[in-house]
Every structure is written in structure tokens, then in C-alpha cells.
């Protein structure tokens, strides 16, 4: 009714509502320019749209080591198929890894609330990890107060981070 009367909404459901209900995310136009993206509302749609646009232009990967990208368990279901298509197209074997949130509890399943220790536990034995930038704050700390530098020291491999889908595709392609 608000959309009909004013031409836009003022209430938006968080992405996790759609994911938990196993419903398709709304199109980007539904989010009215993403006014609440900093709260994670529309972040999945924005990421998917950007990913599809940039990945469509990528044919070959020159990577030497396949990467893992840690994500919340809710995001894994919608993101892994995108990466499977990318891998098939480019001949790579990258993967998203769903990380259980032991720190806050397993019902907390969004990527932005993952902590360094949980990510390290999920990525044991991996040689290359690309962290979503949303897991770090402006001081380069995870929510468990682990620093990015301490994470790099604890991880036995290459650590990179990506701010958005464009950066992620770029890192996966080299």
C-alpha cells in the first residue's frame, strides 16, 4: 500500500527473511536504491547482480591456487551456484565455505556476523582464503576482536579480502 501511495517503501525485509523462507530475493528495483544496505538489507541482491554482470565478462582464470570464501550459512545456498557456474566457465575450483557461527550461536547465520576464530576453524587446511570485507570493521577487527594481522598469522596460506563482487571476481581470476 505504501508503494502504491508514495511510489516506494519505507519498510524492507532483511535478506535473511527471504533466505530462511526459501523465497527468491526481490529484484533490485524493490529496494528503492538500497537505502538500508549498510544494515544488510538488499546486500545479497546487490552482490548477486554485480556478480552476474562482472562474471559474465570473465572467461579464463590465471590463478595458481583455488580459493575459499567464507560466508554465513544462509548466504551459502544462494552464492555457491553462482560460483559453480563461474568455475565451470573458467576451469577453476573455487568454493564458498559455509561457516557455522559458534561465537554468537548457530541461529546467527549472516556473513557480516562471522568472527575470525570461526572462520579459521572452518578453513583449516585451505591454502588461499578471500575474506568478505563485511567481516572486518574499520579498525580491521573481527567481532571477536581478532585483528586482520593476527588472522593472517594464524592462517596457513594466502589471505586476501574483497569489498564487493567485482573485487571478488577479480581476485578469483588471477
Per-range role (PLM):
Residues 1-174:
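Auxiliary Fe-S-binding modules of radical SAM enzymes
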Amino acid at each position: 500500500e505504501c508503494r502504491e501511495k508514495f511510489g516506494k517503501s519505507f519498510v524492507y525485509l532483511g535478506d535473511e527473511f527471504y533466505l530462511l523462507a526459501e523465497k527468491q530475493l526481490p529484484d533490485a528495483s524493490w529496494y528503492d536504491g538500497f537505502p538500508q544496505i549498510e544494515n544488510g538489507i538488499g546486500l545479497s541482491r546487490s552482490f548477486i547482480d554485480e556478480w552476474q554482470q562482472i562474471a559474465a565478462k570473465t572467461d579464463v582464470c590465471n590463478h595458481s591456487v583455488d580459493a575459499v570464501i567464507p560466508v554465513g550459512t544462509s548466504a551459502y545456498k544462494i552464492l555457491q551456484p553462482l560460483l559453480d557456474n563461474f568455475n565451470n566457465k573458467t576451469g577453476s575450483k573455487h568454493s564458498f565455505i559455509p561457516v557455522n557461527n559458534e561465537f554468537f550461536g548457530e541461529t546467527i547465520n549472516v556473513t557480516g556476523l562471522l568472527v575470525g576464530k570461526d572462520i579459521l576453524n572452518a578453513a583449516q587446511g585451505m591454502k588461499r582464503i578471500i575474506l568478505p570485507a563485511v567481516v572486518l570493521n574499520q579498525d580491521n577487527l573481527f567481532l571477536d576482536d581478532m585483528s586482520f594481522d593476527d588472522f593472517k598469522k594464524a592462517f596457513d596460506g594466502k589471505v586476501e579480502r574483497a569489498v564487493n563482487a567485482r573485487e571478488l571476481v577479480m581476485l578469483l581470476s588471477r
